[in-house]
Amino acid sequence: MANIHIIGVTQSSDLIGEALHVMQHARAIIGSERQLDIVKPHLKAKHPAILKTLPKLVELKSLIDDLSIESINDQQSSIIVLASGDPLYYGIGRWFSTHFEPERLRFYPAISSIQMACHRLAISLQDVTVLSLHGRSLKTLRTKLKSAEMLLILTDKHSNPQALARECQDTGFEESLITVLENLSYPHERIRTFSVAQLLDDSEQLSFASLHVSLLEVKGAKGVERMLPEFPGIPDTAYITGSGGGKGMITKREVRLSILSLLQPSNEDVIWDIGAGCGGVAVELAYWNDKTTIYAIECHAERLEHLSANQQRFGVVQNLHIIKGHAPECLADLPEPNKIFIGGSSGNITELLDTVWPLLPKGGLLVVSAVLENTKKALNDFAQTVATINSKTRAEIEVVEVSVKRGQFTHTGLNYTPKLPVEVFKFKKA
């Protein structure tokens, strides 16, 4: 029987039915001062509950354990935790689900601020993308900025409307509109819509209540190429490499797309990118696969600087982790991968192959690109070893050669510049 009840409340919510009953017979009620003030009028004097201000999450479990009594079947032993709106929608509910057995928990949702915002604006919830920047890097917004998207955003002090406007301006979406919905359901509720320019021009004069959500209608000038991609195949020139014009240590677009198609990234993958350079493969992997975890390993100081700059530029700060060090020495402390890409080996390809191949599980993938002849020979030798039927770690092997010629129109007509062919090996552990 549940003895921890997580009840969603809003300023305008009516506590009725089972939620009201358990609250009126609870041993303790935990919530913010604002939430406790909302429920106090509903409590019965003959069943006084202990009222506790919600502590930090690191202290909450011990508080609940201290308040609990042995008999969870006694309704008087119930502990109430107050939550904002729907506890299981970007709320405290997930924390409870990971820290307590499900049979101890019961949830009572109220309308969430996201739902309320949609109703105020007459927008269907299924037509918006909900994003929480609360406690997250503002740069993660960049992975969601696409033309004609409507983003409903839960924010904190680092992602206020002015900060959202700056991100729109910096990424070429300066025609976007931002609607700020403050203090929803409170007497001093306020809804205002701003252009990006208005928010930036009047930045110091404009202030917003701490309780607010923002609707971002993403718009940019038509026909203008923007920094952030909307389809796989990020232009080489979009990366920061220190060389300009798409030059420098990045895997070029045509080869990069071949590598991504061979890696077949999916949710919950852990992928190592060894010799990540300026981040061509790692950044594109992370940008299109936000539930994939990528570790980009690089030892060269200047490339690391550009790799970090590209991580910020494309907003892949949550799922792309940069590791400074030499492989294979720096790999020991990383989470075990199920897929590995080697784009650079500093002449150490044989040792790398011998080190990383045993780490992969059955069905794991190793993808390696090769331009230099000695790298191609080492991969050929490795392929011969793992292709033998008697090999303990046999592999299914696929090899493609990507040859690219890029055309450019000059006064003499169309001229092609051939690029060095790249061999891409894929090994799947059988």
How should each PLM-predicted stretch be described?
Residues 214-220, 339, 409-430:
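Core SAM-dependent methyltransferase catalytic element
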Residues 2-5, 16-18, 59, 150-248:
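A contiguous loop/helix-start segment that scaffolds small-molecule binding in enzyme catalytic cores
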Residues 307-308:
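Conserved SAM-binding loop
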Residues 1-106, 115, 291-294, 298-300, ...:
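Class I S-adenosyl-L-methionine
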Residues 268-277:
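Conserved class I S-adenosyl-L-methionine
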Residues 356-421:
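C-terminal substrate-binding/active-site "lid" region of AdoMet-derived donor-dependent transferases
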Residues 10, 85-148, 328, 394-415:
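Class I SAM-dependent methyltransferase SAM-binding "motif I" and its flanking Rossmann-like core
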Residues 278-290:
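Conserved SAM-binding loop of SAM-dependent methyltransferases across substrates and taxa
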